[in-house]
Amino acid sequence: SEMCIRDRFEPAQAAGQLAVRTELYAKKDSRIRLVQVMMRGEGQELLNDVGCICEENGALDLLQVVVGKGDVYDGIWTELQKDHASLQAEIGYLLQNQQKFDVNLNVRHFGKVTESTIQADGTLMDAAEKIFRGTIDFVRGSADSVGAETEQVLLLGDDVVNKTIPVILCACLLYTSDAADD
């Protein structure tokens, strides 16, 4: 089964904060597509939190677009708990006028033959700031799983700040045996 969810965060009448939490559960053989368009106005902050658990053959396809003038703080946590689960995350942004975009994306591979693909592309101008922390964690038991993270950023000016912190974690087994000495 498949489901598509669309969120639009539009400018409010006054400055302030908006906090949104989206929790998803992709059951066996299901696919969830989450599309989020973030268009906050100047002086408006968006705190966005997405969490998803994917069972066997479960998938999350995430598309996030950041436009507008407000600051965005984005947290994404996905657990690929069963075999053949997957995450495809695509993030696009146009940041300007000292706008801030702070992303912390974590995907944990538990099942076998799981897959994660993370693509973040955008443009920074007018003293805008972006920090992207992307972590792909291969937990013990996630044999034959794969993950990829790519990013393309267009920097329009010497006053922009672009920080990217990619992390890949991989559980390691250490074997010791007297038989190895034979």
Predicted regions and their residues:
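A short, hydrophobic C-terminal helix/tail in secreted or cell-surface proteins
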Residues: D178-D182
